[in-house]
Amino acid sequence: RLKRELVALNVVYDDVNMRHNHAEGQRLLDHLCHLASASDVPMVTQVRVAANIANGIKHAFKEFQASEILMGLHFHKEINRSFWGEFTRSLYNGLSRQIIVTRILQPLNTIRRIQVAIPSRAEFEPGFYRWLERLARMAGNLECRIAFHGRNETLQLVNEFIRNRFPSVR
């Protein structure tokens, strides 16, 4: 159970479309708040106007004293490479916290397997066990299998952690 509320944030550019995008963002957040309350999850929402999206996220992160960021990836057919380069660099440089970027294309309750590619020497990074715990908890809640791919040394640590902390996860 959560001990504090989730924060749902929508950041819109301060441009000529700001009013329209602000209204759309508020409508989206209202829907999200309704879904959260149906699941008995406390949530606060905010539509923030910013000249720089990454800065808008960073400022909200600090104001709400958030512990991590879960960010949805948009569904545009083409993703501009320069957007990801500058945006992620700006966001990562401003925060030393876990940032999860996800693009969920199907309902979560239909997922039967999670495939995880672990970068080389990831076990030496801060937050290694934190994201591992998040994935194991998600696999347990979804009752699906989880498969890890990486170096043997890392996989031994992962398997030991899962076996000791989440014995029901397969």
How does the language model describe each region?
Residues H22, V47-A51, R81:
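Conserved phosphate/pyrophosphate-binding and hydrolysis machinery centered on Walker-type P-loop NTPases
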Residues D30-H34, N55-K62, R89, E133:
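Solvent-exposed alpha-helical segments within well-ordered globular domains of core cellular machineries
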Residues A38-I69, R165-R170:
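Structural beta-alpha unit
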Residues A8, T45-Q46, I99-V101, R170:
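Conserved beta-strand scaffold positions in the cores of enzyme catalytic domains, especially
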Residues Y13-D15, A51-I53, E153-L155:
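Short, internal active-site loops enriched in acidic
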Residues E24, H59-E63, I114-V116:
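Short, surface-exposed amphipathic charged segments that create phosphate/polyanion-binding patches used
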Residues R1-Q46, R121-P126, R130, L135, ...:
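Non-transmembrane accessory domains of multi-pass membrane transporters/channels
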Residues R1, S67-E160, R165-V169:
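Intrinsically disordered or low-complexity boundary/linker segments at protein termini
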